[in-house]
Amino acid sequence: MEKVNSETGKIIVIEGACDGMGKSTQFELLKRRLQEDGRELVNHHFPSYGTFHGEPVVRYLKGELGEPAFLSPYMVNSLYAVDRAIAWNKHLREQWQEGKVILLDRYTTSSLIYQSALITDIEEKKAFIDYVCEFEYEKMGIGKPDDVIFLHAPFDLVTEMRNARKSNDGVPNDIHERDIEFMK
């Protein structure tokens, strides 16, 4: 597995506590700013909609794999992990090794947030978080973020913003967005 060193680029991730927070807007603003500053960058949105490796995640988000409460967080994370690993190996790794900024809309932090939310036991939750980090960064060899920008806003405001939009990259009201208690 490759190790992070000073000769590689940076990985910057924009995350949010729930969908509809304005991540895409902030992503575009940061992207524009980095470009104006002359930084070479590559950007990617996860899940990778419209790709063969993002398709299982899209099916999950549409509810075609069952209700999240009945699915193992480890299984669900595996869908996302494969998407991230293929995108990393096909598109992102080489750019990162060339010193470019990799700007990501969602990444591993999303699995840590969404899948661990369904785990009630604190020790099991910690074990899951450790598992995701080891599995994805060490075993699968994807790049570890240098910076994660985490957006937070009041739930009522986020709900209003989310309800005002038509779809989430072609997935109208995904399984998490339909579950208000989960989103809280």
Predicted feature locations:
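Residues in and immediately flanking transmembrane alpha helices
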Residues: 28-32, 36, 118-119, 165
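Flexible, glycine-rich phosphate/dinucleotide-binding loops
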Residues: 20, 50-52, 157
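Hydrophobic "anchor" residues on beta-strands that sit immediately upstream
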Residues: 11, 15, 101, 142, ...
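Generic detector of well-ordered alpha-helical packing
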Residues: 16-20, 106-107, 147, 153
